[in-house]
UniProtKB/Swiss-Prot annotation:
Antitoxin component of a type II toxin-antitoxin (TA) system. Functions as an mRNA interferase antitoxin; overexpression prevents YafO-mediated cessation of cell growth and inhibition of cell proliferation. This is Antitoxin YafN. Belongs to the phD/YefM antitoxin family. The gene is yafN. Keywords: DNA damage, DNA repair, DNA-binding, Repressor, SOS response, Toxin-antitoxin system, Transcription, Transcription regulation. It comes from Escherichia coli (strain K12). GO terms for cellular component: toxin-antitoxin complex.
């Protein structure tokens, strides 16, 4: 069973006749074969949703997604070593944390 997460719904055939009619201030489920294929939102509803998501993201710590392969880590290490070897004493003296 598929959940429909909107109070209003429209099938794709009806949506094609007049799409602008369904961009209202609440979500509209778009159905295909009586199953939700997607949802329509007005610009203001979408902006409000994005604002809520941004607020939530600010409250949560960021999860790292940097998971390089062993070969990629070796390449990063090799390049870092090369950069360090190429640095001059002046480069090291200019470093500030």
């Amino acid at each position: 069973m598929h959940r429909i997460l909107a109070e209003k719904s429209v099938n794709i055939t009806e949506l094609r006749k007049n799409p602008a009619k369904y961009f209202i201030d609440q979500p509209v489920a778009v159905l295909s074969n009586n199953r939700p294929a997607g949802y329509l939102l007005s610009a203001s509803a979408f902006e409000a949703l994005m604002d809520m998501l941004a607020e939530q993201e600010e409250k949560k710590p960021i999860k790292a997604r940097f998971r390089p392969s062993a070969a990629r880590l070796e390449e990063i290490t090799r390049r870092a070593e090369q950069y360090l070897n190429d640095m001059t004493d002046d480069d090291f003296n200019d470093f500030k944390e």
